[in-house]
Curated annotation (Swiss-Prot):
It comes from the Eukaryota. This is Probable E3 ubiquitin ligase complex SCF subunit sconB. Keywords: Repeat, Transcription, Transcription regulation, Ubl conjugation pathway, WD repeat. Pathway: Protein modification; protein ubiquitination.
Length: 706
């Protein structure tokens, strides 16, 4: 209890020692009348603040009047004010600050009694054990000191006594003193108090709060406010620039539309984004109060390098001078690894730098700022393409596949082997699969140009293919979809379309396949039961493309336009439309059950939204669970041959030689690109660029990175 009492008493302002010295008799007032007048003035001031017995006040007033009439009298009345001052002021100071003001032997030993008194409670700003206690402002105290020194010594002593009394008073007495002073202030003085208090009551709440709460507050700010917060102080900058805050910002905006601000940033590998979330949350609770921990959380606490779709890895590249300067080492800067170990050490960028990079790309997409590169080499129309990192693969009616370096524009190699025009292709890190009008599919080592194997089975030309993991689906002129299983070497056909099947998309998560056909329909197939789960009707022209949207895509139902479109219908082999309308979408179980009994046991549902294009010059956005057409995109003058989509935009190419970029949520055409002299037949879409192929034998790549 003694130590607690000592800590409470030490909670007074750091300038109290100076004030106490000023409160002691100065010794400079040697003339009795001057000393008497000063003490009388002090006593009058104190009693006007604290109040007192009326007889004492009358005695002081009488003596004051007597002194005014007899300024040089040194009678017994001259000693009375000094005694009264000592009687009323000194005991007050001794009671509340005995360590600094009380004479020897007069200090109280009963600490328990002092602490039990309600007057011993200090307000939170003067408790030394509280973090948010306001410290003395050194510049203000220096200014106060200089102004005080300009006054006569008698005035200095009187003012110092008032300060000493207030500094020594507990919370209850302080309020009374302030109320009395405020009651006597005029309007200019009250205005001065208001202006002064406005600044004094401000506290650094981010420093006072625990780090995890400070991060929670900062996560509610937008990017502009965060940057302004970082300019407040070094402490605020450490908090506002921390990975905890900017990881949340990336998670909220990258590859999706933010519901608050409407902004969405280009694609980032969301798997890595989700994997690092737990480490970021742990980092927030273990943040060092003296500043952010160096490389806390290791590799998982940093963002993957968002350079391109699918293969964005935030590994340092010596050729990337622009980003290398902001990358940081994951290991300690003091412990330098061996040269070989340093060579293989992964480097990372702060999440703020990742957001900054994505924001620049997103702004370029919004305003159409891009650079264009043209690839020429094919002797006939380009019908298919795909790009990853700096590799571009194109297939043409000249029966060749060309591999390009997107950075230099150089043709790396040409793959020859098909006997007719190539209508579709897809590649990954190890292989490239192509489909041709010669009814075959070929598997290539695109790095060497070697044809590894050839698959036949269709009775017509192969005009569409898509593989995911171990499943390959091919679409053919023979009106069928063929499924190839690389794992068990099995194959089977999906029959149901009545005309050419132009495009297929495999979803291995739900084990389903989408197909688009010249019979103006889109079908959803179950790979386990080989049954058609859903048929989408609505297009009045041959459907050329179908693209499932990522599962992160969100669409507000109130934005739907085609709810009452009688021409947009759906049919299923196991359910009726009325049953689909009756079943809600309130849970995942309900969402999967609309596709049949095979989805009742927790099997993942197919992608909820798909986008299709047709030769009726329109693009449609569908909801797979109900079969509704949510939105129709109008703008192309002729049939839409090519389509690409992600969570932020839809890119389409048509017979009218134009490429259009759409907002999938509003249906608005954001930008139109021209340049091809023939119909646009294929499109590849990435996070910061897209490529188009045309019957004019050219491929054009638009980059929004620079």
């Amino acid at each position: 209890m003694q130590s607690d009492d000592r800590s409470v008493r030490e909670g007074s302002d750091s300038s109290q020692t100076f004030l106490m010295k000023m409160a002691q008799p100065t010794g400079e007032l040697t003339h009795p009348s001057q000393q008497q007048q000063q003490q009388l003035l002090q006593q009058q001031s104190f009693r006007s603040i604290f109040g007192g017995a009326s007889d004492t006040a009358e005695e002081i007033d009488t003596e004051t009047d007597s002194n005014h009439r007899r300024p040089h009298s040194f009678g017994a009345a001259a000693t009375t004010p000094a005694k009264l001052a000592n009687k009323n002021v000194a005991p007050f100071l001794v009671k509340h600050i005995p360590e600094q003001y009380g004479p020897l032997g007069s200090r109280r030993t009963d600490k328990l009694e002092d602490l039990s008194s309600p007057n011993s409670k200090f307000c939170y700003r003067h408790r030394p054990d509280l973090k948010c206690r306001r410290q003395a402002d050194e510049p203000s105290m220096d200014k106060l000191q200089r102004e005080l020194e300009t006054l006569p010594p008698s005035d200095q002593q009187g003012i110092a006594h008032v300060w000493s009394l207030f500094s020594a008073a507990p919370a209850k007495h302080r309020k009374l003193i302030l109320q009395g002073i405020m009651a006597q202030c005029c309007f200019p003085q009250l205005s001065f108090v208001s202006a002064t208090v406005r600044d004094l009551i401000r506290i650094d709440f981010l420093t006072a709060l625990p780090p995890e709460i400070s991060f929670k507050i900062l996560c509610y700010l937008d990017t502009t406010s965060l940057c302004k917060a970082a300019q407040v102080s070094s402490r605020w900058r450490a908090l506002a620039d921390d990975d905890v805050v900017w990881h949340r910002m990336c998670e909220q905006h990258i590859h999706r539309k933010c519901k608050k601000c409407g902004w969405g940033l280009p694609l980032l590998e969301r798997k890595r984004l989700r994997e690092s979330k737990r480490e970021i949350e742990l980092r927030a609770t273990t943040w060092d109060v003296s500043g952010p921990a160096q490389n806390a959380g290791g590799a998982e606490c940093s963002a993957p390098h968002a350079d391109d779709v699918i293969t964005q890895k935030r590994k340092a590249d010596s050729s990337d001078d622009e980003t290398a300067i902001v990358k940081r080492h994951c290991s300690s800067l003091d412990a330098r690894p061996e040269p070989d170990e340093d060579y293989y050490t992964t480097r990372y960028r702060p999440w703020k730098e990742v957001y900054k990079d994505r924001f620049k790309v997103g702004t370029n997409w919004k305003y159409g700022r891009c650079s264009t590169k043209v690839f020429k080499g094919h002797t006939n129309g380009v019908m298919c393409l795909q790009f990853e990192d700096n590799i571009l693969a194109t297939g043409s009616y000249d029966a060749t596949i060309k591999i390009w370096d997107t950075e230099t524009g150089e043709e790396l190699r040409t793959l020859r082997g098909h006997q007719s025009g190539i209508r579709c292709l897809q590649f990954d890190d190890t292989k490239l699969i192509s489909g041709s009008m010669d009814r075959s599919l070929k598997v290539w080592n695109w790095r060497t140009g070697e044809c590894i194997s050839t698959y036949t089975g269709h009775r017509g030309g192969v005009i569409g293919l898509h593989f995911d993991a171990t499943i390959l689906a091919s679409a053919s002129v023979d009106k069928t979809v063929k499924i190839w299983n690389f794992e068990d070497k099995s194959t089977f056909l999906l029959r149901g379309h009545t005309d050419w099947v132009n495009a297929v998309r495999v979803d291995t998560t739900s084990r389903t396949v989408f197909s688009a056909s010249d019979d103006c329909t889109v079908r959803l197939w179950d790979l386990d039961t080989k049954a058609c789960l859903r048929t989408f009707h609505g297009h009045v022209g041959q459907v050329q493309q179908v693209v499932p949207l990522p599962r992160e895509f969100e669409f507000e139902d109130h934005d739907a336009e085609c709810d009452n479109d009688n021409m947009s219908t759906t049919s299923g082999d196991t359910e009726s439309n009325s049953l689909q309308a009756t079943l809600g979408l309130e849970s995942n179980a309900t969402e999967t059950s609309v596709f049949g009994p095979s989805f009742d046991n927790g099997r993942p549902a197919p992608p909820r939204y798909i986008v299709t294009s047709a030769l009726d010059s329109t693009i449609r956005l569908w909801e797979t669970t109900t079969g509704r057409c949510l939105r129709t995109f109008f703008g192309h003058l002729e049939g839409v041959w090519a389509l690409g989509a992600d969570t932020l935009r839809i890119v389409s190419g048509a017979e009218d030689r134009m490429v259009k970029i759409w907002d999938p949520r509003t249906g608005k055409c954001e930008r139109t690109f021209t340049g091809h002299s023939g119909p646009v037949t294929c499109i590849g879409l990435g996070d910061s660029r897209f490529a188009t192929g045309s019957e004019d034998c050219e491929v054009r790549m638009y980059s929004f990175r620079n």
